[in-house]
Amino acid sequence: NISGLYVVGDLTGIPLLKFSADTGARAVQHILTDGVFQRDKGPVEIMDLAIVGAGVSGMSATLEARKAGLSFVQFEATEPFSTVVNFPKEKPIYTYPTEMVPAGDMRFVAQIKESLVAELYEQTLAQGIEPTLARVERVEKRGDHFELHIPDRENVKARRVVIGIGRSGNFRKLGVPGEDSVKVFNRLHDPVDFDDKDVLVVGGGDSALEAAIAIAQCGGRVTVSYREPDFFRPKPENVEKL
């Protein structure tokens, strides 16, 4: 644990939209109630907050920081909400737990991927939030503040840091011959691409089952390979559809 640095979103171990939004907002709320934290004190080049990542958790933190009037900067390596943008076409959205209202201002109503993207954009980008496109290589503690190292840029200094980079880029490899083939994918963009093709989906979580269901519905012949005899991780709706 590093005082003043907060990890939010998927990296906390719960990859659900509402939990991601909740952790982002609560991190900033915790900063605001921290008796040690003093905003806008000391050198003007030191920001109150730096947010790394512009996914659901990072954007939720940004909304909370702006509402509180903090000086902040947000960095995103690819594009805002990249994980959601890269969901399969027309992927169904389940906002579990249904009764949960996450901390902060971000809300979820959409039931398919495209509507969710539009909904998220409307709540953030359309409201003037503009993350800086840059990859943060590392974060170092320097006394009472942090320094963010960014290639080809001057280091950025901040009193507090929120890390919401997600886990979508860290896909697990099987360690088997042939997995580097052009026929092997770690993400499904459009299931229509697999019409009338034989497809092996490896995995037993929601992503794997949703990919298998979508490909089958679009005319693909699908086999699911899972290391357990039963599915216990996916949502009941996905198991029923399979």
Locations of regions flagged by a protein language model:
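Rossmann-like dinucleotide/flavin-binding elements
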Residues: 1-73, 77, 187-234
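Glycine-rich beta-alpha-beta "Rossmann" dinucleotide-binding loop(s) and their flanking helix/strand
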Residues: 152, 160-189
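Active-site acidic short loop of glycosyltransferases
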Residues: 158-159, 196
